[in-house]
Each structure stands twice: as C-alpha cells, then as structure tokens.
Amino acid sequence: MLLSIGMLMLSATQIYTIVTVQLFAFLNLLPVEADILAYNFENGTQTFDDLPARFGYRLPAEGLKGFLINSKPENACEPIAPPPLRDNSSTAFIVLIRRLECNFDIKVLNAQRAGYKAAIVHNVDSDDLISMGSNDIEILKKIDIPSVFIGEASANSLKEEFTYEKGGHVVLIPEFSLPLEYYLIPFLIIVGICLILIVIFMITKFVQDRHRARRNRLRKDQLKKLPVHKFKKGDEYDVCAICLDEYEDGDKLRILPCSHAYHCKCVDPWLTKTKKTCPVCKQKVVPSQGDSDSETDSSQEENEVSENTPLLRPLASVSTQSFGALSESHSHQNMTESSEYEEDDNDNIDSSDAESGVNEESVVVQLQPNDERDYRVTNTV
C-alpha cells in the first residue's frame, strides 16, 4: 500500500514538473496579440497590432486574406453597403468599421449580413486596444464571422494605403494563445492531485510509525504486572545500570523477567516510551501471565532484527530463573565439571602408570643379553 502510494506520488510529481516546464515554455513562445499584415499596390508590407473579439468564430490557422473596404455608414450601427461583386467567388472582403454609437455585436452582425467575411473595428481618438464583448446571447448566436479591434493610427494607415480601391489587401493572422481557463484549470487539477497524494502518504506513514512505536512499547497495564522489590541491605542487587547509582534502603526496584533490576523511576520511562526490552540484555520484557498480546505478534517481534538486537540472545530458560537459581546452577555446574576433571585426572594418572610400566618392561627387555634374544628369535622362527 505504502509503496504504491509512493509510486503514484512520484508519477504525479513528474507529471507536474513536465507540465509546468512545457506550460511556461509554451506561454513564452505565444504572441499576446494577433497581427494584421497589410500589402499595398507596390507590394509594400506593414504590420498592425490588433485584439480579437470575444465572440464570433476564430480566425483560421492559416490566416484570413481579403480586400479591405470602408464601411458605409462608418459606424455600421445600421445595415451597411455590401462588398463589390467579383468574378472570383472565393475572394473575401473585410470591412473597416468605426467605434462608438452602438454595441460591437451589432456592428459585426450588420457586416456579416452584408456579406463580409470579417470585420475590423477601430478606436476613436485613441490607440488603445479594447477586448470586444457582448451581453446579448441572441445576437451572439447569430454571429459567425471573426472580428478584431485596432487603434486609430492603424486605421488611418490602412485607409491611406491598403484599401481595395488603392490596390491593397490585408491578411488577418490569428493568435494562438489559449484562454486562461484552458491551461489554468488542468494546472490546478494536477497541483491538487499532487497535494492530495502527499497528504495521503504522510498520513499513512504517520499511522504506521505510530502503530510500530506502540507495538514496541510497554503498556501501563503490562508495566503494573512486573514485580516491584523494595531494596534492603544484603540483597544481591547493588547498582542501577541506567543511572549508575548504588541502591539504598527503601529504593523501589523493578525486577524484569531476565532478573535484572533497575530503579522504577529509571526503567519505567524506558519501557513505556522507548522499547519494551531490558536495557542491558535486550531481552523482551513481557509479563508471563495475562499478556494481552497474541502469540503471533510476540513471535513476529522476536523475529525482528534491528541494530539494537544483541548478537548473543539469552536462553529462554534463563529468563525464568532468579539470581539465586542462576548462582546455584552455576555452582552445581562447577562441581560437576570439577568432578569430571578429577575423574579425568585419575584416568590420566592410571594410563600414565600403565605406560610407565610398559616402558620399564621394554627397558628390561632391551637390557637382556644378546644371545638370549637371538635364542628367542630362533625358537620363534
């Protein structure tokens, strides 16, 4: 579960990084405004900035080429004159309209009804570019042609050199920048997914660490089951291995199943907040009776190996013996070993005596006269 969440988070992070880099690179390459390329009779070229309207169709990707015609009337608030007739039906005409006196959507709709393929609306007494919009849904549904907005200086230049009467033509270049909601919404979705995955990963890890720490610590009810001994002079315990202070009369000692004793104030925080093991021998400190942990959990804990696990684990039988039993068994073992050593010594002495007798006999044999040995050899043959 944790591994799969980590893989998902890694994938989401990679996607987020790639999308962010590509998005910024894409936005830096995109133009913020469309352009109008104007060609006069002598093939002279000039470029004008424009701003597309928020209604109507978008310009085709290859651009829209057409002949520029001045609107009659110029404000196009009423039906305007249609474009001139030409033999080539594929020829497009673009109308130039003046701003003010009526809404933008009315101007563009009148241009569409007159037969124009696009409309250019110019500002009055200003070169500022305005984003043309509309609040009338019924009119918006009827508008099919694209339209752009230009400044007054650009409109004057177009009228002087690039109209249809003067042999010029224009090309409306579309803008390729996407609206804000086109890339902002996917960006926010990806960021949200990454944050959700990170939160899930952190919560899962916190729960697992909390469960692992709780499993490795001793509960309060388990701690109460461990015996407490009041120290008296003459006891076999002498020094607390945690605080290194000598025991005094009346000190409360916590006796662990491994027979190690510590001050209650020293060992209790260790058992309940750190690990339920003996600080010295690392043996598990679990009450022998009434332990609520299952055998499966205890076996799993015993099989777990960590950096704190001792290289030589104490035998299970040792955990149930007291210091007196340990000393008694140790003395009994020493007596047994000493008796064995004595028997071995006696055997060694007997064997050494036998060997010495054999050696003496061989020496005696070797000291016998040569003729007797020859005689024995002859009889043997």
UniProtKB/Swiss-Prot annotation:
Task: Name the domain of life.
Answer: Eukaryota
Entry-linked InterPro entries: E3_ligase_sorting_rcpt, PA_dom_sf, PA_domain, Znf_RING, Znf_RING/FYVE/PHD, ZNRF4/RNF13/RNF167_PA
* Gene Ontology CC terms: cytoplasm; cytosol; endoplasmic reticulum; endoplasmic reticulum membrane; late endosome membrane; lysosomal membrane; nuclear inner membrane; nucleoplasm
- Induction or repression: By myostatin.
The entry lists its GO molecular-function terms as: JUN kinase binding; ubiquitin protein ligase activity; ubiquitin-protein transferase activity; zinc ion binding
Q: Where is the composition biased (Basic and acidic residues)?
A: 370-381
UniProt-annotated stretches for the region Disordered:
285-381
**Membrane topology, from the record:** Single-pass type I membrane protein
Q: Which reactions fall under this protein's catalytic activity?
A: S-ubiquitinyl-[E2 ubiquitin-conjugating enzyme]-L-cysteine + [acceptor protein]-L-lysine = [E2 ubiquitin-conjugating enzyme]-L-cysteine + N(6)-ubiquitinyl-[acceptor protein]-L-lysine
Q: In the UniProt annotation, what is the result of changing H260A?
A: Decrease in E3 ligase activity. Loss of myoblast growth suppression activity
Query: Which regions of this chain are Cytoplasmic-facing, per the record's topological domains?
Result: 204-381
Q: What is its EC number?
A: 2.3.2.27
Main location, first listed in the record: endoplasmic reticulum
Instruction: Report the pathway entry.
Output: Protein modification; protein ubiquitination
**Glycosylated residues?**
N88
- Expressing tissues: Widely expressed (at protein level). Lowest levels in the liver, moderate levels in the heart, intestine and spleen, and high levels in skeletal muscle, kidney, proventriculus and brain. Also expressed in inner ear after noise exposure.
Zinc fingers (RING-type) by residue:
240-282
TM stretches of this protein: 183-203
Q: Which residues lie on this side of the membrane: Lumenal?
A: 35-182
- Where located? Endoplasmic reticulum membrane; Late endosome membrane; Lysosome membrane; Nucleus inner membrane
Q: Name one Pfam family in it.
A: zf-RING_2
Q: Which of UniProt's keywords are assigned here?
A: Endoplasmic reticulum, Endosome, Glycoprotein, Lysosome, Membrane, Metal-binding, Nucleus, Signal, Transferase, Transmembrane, Transmembrane helix, Ubl conjugation pathway, Zinc, Zinc-finger
**Domains (record comment):** The RING-type zinc finger domain is required for E3 ligase activity and for promoting ER stress-induced JNK activation and apoptosis.
Role summary: E3 ubiquitin-protein ligase that regulates cell proliferation. Involved in apoptosis regulation. Mediates ER stress-induced activation of JNK signaling pathway and apoptosis by promoting ERN1 activation and splicing of XBP1 mRNA.
Protein name from the UniProt record? E3 ubiquitin-protein ligase RNF13
